[in-house]
Regions:
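N-terminal presequence-like segments and the immediate start of the first folded domain
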Residues: 2-12, 18-160, 164-167
């Protein structure tokens, strides 16, 4: 098989699937040994957009499974190898949504923006919003709207949304 040679800085989105969400702190300890990767990434505190989800089970009874979206690689179509350095990866955070030291709210590359999963947190208090699933969903979507608008887009530009619910 052919391998692509890309640095971790080219990762724009990470999805973490955990058998037990209580293991997230241990995952974070490992995660911070990989991100940020390069001196440049550390200087600007670049980390990919990120989602963590608890799942009922994983292949081979694993405790964690991680997937990544990479912005480009040597010769990845439609870019030629020599065009690789012309691709821009642009991270952005807004104060209108909760921030996390381990992820960026949105990471743009090509004509896509990858947005980190949003929890129903009041960005001013850092606490879950009052109410049920309707109020919590509205808060999550308000964060997504604020993030989308902070990069000059509107909700009509969103092409995919993943929703994770307890019941």
């Amino acid at each position: 098989s052919d391998l692509i040679d890309v640095p971790f800085d080219d990762i724009v989105k990470i999805n973490i699937y955990l058998k037990n969400l209580s293991d997230i702190e241990a995952v974070n300890q490992a995660y911070t040994t990989f991100f940020p990767d390069s001196a440049i990434a550390r200087t600007v505190a670049y980390v990919p957009a990120r989602t963590a989800v608890e799942v009922a089970g994983l292949p081979m009874n694993a405790l964690v499974q991680i997937e990544a979206v990479v912005s480009h690689g040597d010769g990845t179509p439609p870019q030629a190898v020599e065009d690789r350095h012309g691709i821009v990866i642009k991270p952005n955070n807004t104060d209108k949504a909760p921030k996390c030291a381990l992820s960026t709210q949105t990471v743009a590359f090509s004509h896509y923006n990858n947005i980190s999963a949003q929890l129903p947190i009041d960005p001013k208090t850092g606490k879950l919003v009052a109410g049920g699933v309707k109020e919590q969903a509205a808060q999550c979507l308000s964060h997504i709207k604020a993030i989308v608008e902070s990069i000059g887009h509107k909700m009509d530009d969103v092409v995919k949304v993943n929703v994770f619910v307890k019941n």
